[in-house]
């Protein structure tokens, strides 16, 4: 499961909610028979997500963070995998005890300036890697973020240059400045630690 929440949302401008709706639409587009996703808002603007795939929620968190604009209102992500099957009945009624643990974990990072990811009993190595990922996501410019999004999908710098109407050297500069290569190492490390395919 994954809970996404906007930090300091009571002071956020209305366009923040447009970003959250955009992320929700992008995540919903990943729903399939092989990977079932359920999303609903709980407790205000908290986006609650269930996935039928174990540990998939951390990858969804990375995807959501890559779409979120750097701002004074960071998107906080708390994830956890439970040893339970995906609820085939109405998932809105699914009420597992670990939901509270995920919410409590989210509360520990609500005001954090260095961590936007949490999970109950998260190993120290993953915690440190996600602090670095937080710093990367929080410091990108809009162009760096766009380049990062393309790069993470496997598109070459030459293709990114065409898509963004920029030179290859400009894209190369923004790939370096966005630290997306370091981010891919973090993602690979997390995938390896959680034994994801």
What would you call each of these model-derived segments?
Residues 175, 182:
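DNA major-groove recognition helix of helix-turn-helix
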Residues 144-151:
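Short alpha-helical "packing" element that flanks the helix-turn-helix/winged-helix DNA-binding module
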Residues 187-197:
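Short, basic, alpha-helical segments at the C-terminal edge of helix-turn-helix-like DNA-binding modules
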Residues 82, 88-93, 108-131:
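Flexible, glycine/charge-rich interdomain/linker segments that couple
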Residues 137-144:
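Short helix-coil-helix linker/hinge
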Residues 106, 110, 138, 168:
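Regulatory/sensor and coupling segments of signal-transduction and defense proteins
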Residues 1-99, 103:
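DNA-contacting interfaces and partner/effector-binding or oligomerization modules
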Residues 156-164, 171:
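Short alpha-helical "recognition helix" segments of helix-turn-helix
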């Amino acid at each position: 499961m994954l809970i996404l929440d906007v930090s300091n949302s009571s002071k956020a401008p209305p366009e923040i909610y447009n970003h959250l709706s955009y992320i929700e639409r992008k995540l919903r587009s990943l729903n399939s028979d092989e990977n079932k996703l359920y999303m609903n808002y709980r407790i205000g603007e908290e986006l609650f997500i269930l996935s039928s795939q174990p540990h998939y929620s951390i990858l969804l968190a990375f995807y959501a963070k890559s779409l979120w604009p750097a701002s004074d209102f960071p998107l906080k992500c708390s994830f956890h995998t439970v040893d339970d099957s995906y609820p085939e009945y109405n998932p809105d009624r699914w009420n597992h005890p670990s939901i509270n643990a995920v919410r409590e974990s989210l509360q520990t990072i609500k005001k954090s300036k260095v961590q936007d990811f949490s999970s109950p009993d998260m190993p120290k190595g993953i915690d440190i890697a996600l602090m670095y990922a937080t710093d990367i996501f929080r410091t990108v410019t809009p162009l760096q973020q766009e380049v990062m999004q393309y790069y993470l999908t496997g598109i070459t710098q030459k293709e990114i240059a065409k898509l963004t109407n920029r030179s290859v050297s400009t894209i190369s500069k923004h790939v370096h400045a966005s630290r997306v290569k370091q981010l891919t190492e973090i993602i690979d490390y997390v995938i390896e630690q959680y034994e994801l395919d």
